[in-house]
Amino acid sequence: MFRNKIVLEEKFRLNVERLLYALVFTMVFEGLIRKLLPSAVGLLIFFLKDIFCITGLYFITKAFAKPNVQRNPFFNLRKIFFFVFLPPLIVTNFYDPSLVLFALKQYLLYMILALLVPLAFVPAKIERFKKFFFFFSLTVIPTTLVAVLQNSLPANHWLNQSVDGQSLEAFSAGGLLRVSSTFSFTGQYSWFLNVVCVILAVSFCLPIKRDNIIIKKIAPLLPLVISVCLAVGAFITGGRTAVLGCGLVLFLGFIFAVIKAPQKIITRGLILMAVMGLSLTALRIAKPEFFKVYDLRSEDKKDETHSEEVEGRILKDMFGWTVWIAEQDMIPFLFGNGLGVMSNGAEKISSYARDVRMQGISTESEIDSTAWEGGMYLVLIWFGMRIWVIIRCIGLWRQARDTNTIIAMSFLLGYITVIGFYGALSRQPPIAIWFWLSIGCFVALYYYDKSLQSSNA
C-alpha cells in the first residue's frame, strides 16, 4: 500500500514536470511553429500555453487537497486576490460579459505557476531541477541561430514575416528588420532573453551532474557558447528591452548575491564581466551586422540623447496615466472601463474591446493599462500585490543559507524585482508566464535550501 502511494506520487510529480517542459518548449517555439502550420492550427498553438496552465490548475487542486502537502508561501495569494478583484470584474460584466473570463485569464491564471514548479521539483529531485534549468538555458542556442538566419534573409522571406504571413517592415529600424527568432514578434523574443539570462546564471550556480559521456565532453564549452549566443541574441533583436533588460536583471541579481555571499560572488562576477566584455568586443569586430539595428535605435537624436529618451519613456510609462485619469467620470475613475480590453486578442472575442480599439484608444505602459481597465482601485491592488510578492520573496531569500542556492535565488530575485515593478503582466501573457514561473523556481530553491538546513541540523 505504502509502495503504491510512493509510485503514484512520483507519477503525479513526473506529469507536472512534463507539463512544465511542454510549456517552456511551446513558449519558446510557438512563433516558428505557427509560421509552419496552417492558420487554423496556429490558433490552437496560440492557446496551448493557456491549456497547459488550466491543466496545471487541475494538478494544483489535486495536490493541495491532500492534508500533508507542504504549503506554498503564495498558496493563498490567488484566492485572496480573486476576492479583492471582484469589484472591477463586476464592472467589466456590465461593459461586456465575454471579457470576464478573458480578464481572469490575463490577471489570475498564470499565478498557478508559482505553485506548480515546487510540486514538480521537490528537494529530493534537485538533480532533475538542475536539468530543467539546463534545458531552459540551452534554448538560447536555437533561438539565436534562427535570429542570425533571419538577419541574413530579406524582409519578404516567410521566416521574417508575422505568423499571419504579413510584412513586419513597419517595425524595422533605419530600414533594417528587427528579428523575432522563433517567437511571434520581437517583444516576445526580448522578454524571453530577459528571463533566460537569469536561468543561465542559475544553471551556472547549480550545474548538472556530468553522468553522461556527451555532457562530459561538451560541458566545458557550453557556458561560453550559451553566453555568446545570449549576447548575440540580445543585440541582434535591435530592442532596448533585451539589452537593457538583461543588463538590469543581471546587475540587480549580482547586487543581491554580493549582499548575501560576497566572498564567492565578487571574484567570479568580475571574471564573468571581463569575459563578457571581451566577447562583446570581439563580436562587434567580427560581426558588426549583429549590432547594427541596436546601434541605430540607440543613436542620439537632434533634440535629445539616447539616455534622455530612455529616461523620458520610463517617466512617461510610470506617470503618464496621472494626466488623463483625473478627467474620467467617477465609476471609470474608481473601477475602470473594463478589464482585459487593452490586451492582445481582446478585440477578437469582445465587440466592446473592438469598438474601443476602433476609436483609437490605446495605452502603452502597464500602469496606463491598469488605470484605464480597472481604475484607481485596480492600480492599488494590482501593484500592491506585486510589491507584496517582491517583499515576500526577499523575506524567503534572507532565510537561505547554502551559498550556491543563495546566489541562484539572488539572480531570480533580480528578475522578479525588475519585472514585478515594470513588466506588463496584465497585458502580455508571455511576460506573466515567465514571471510566475521564475517565482515558482525561486520557491522550489527555497524549499531545497530548507531541506539542506534540516539535514545539517
Predicted region positions:
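Loop-to-helix entry and N-terminal half of a specific, functionally important transmembrane alpha helix
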Residues: 18-27, 220-228, 392-423, 441
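Transmembrane alpha-helices of multi-pass inner-membrane enzymes
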Residues: 54-60, 196-198, 250-251, 408-457
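Interfacial loop-to-transmembrane-helix boundary motif in multi-pass membrane proteins
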Residues: 13-20, 24-25, 73-82, 117-156, ...
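Alpha-helical transmembrane segments of multi-pass inner-membrane proteins
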Residues: 133-161, 171-174, 181-259
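Long extracytoplasmic/lumenal interhelical loops at the membrane interface
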Residues: 32, 304-374
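N-terminal hydrophobic segments of proteins, predominantly signal-anchor/transmembrane helices
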Residues: 16-35, 50-108, 413-416
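A conserved mid-to-late transmembrane alpha helix and its immediate loop/hinge
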Residues: 185-187, 354-393
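A membrane-periplasm/extracellular boundary helix in multi-pass inner-membrane enzymes
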Residues: 145, 150-155, 237, 254-306, ...
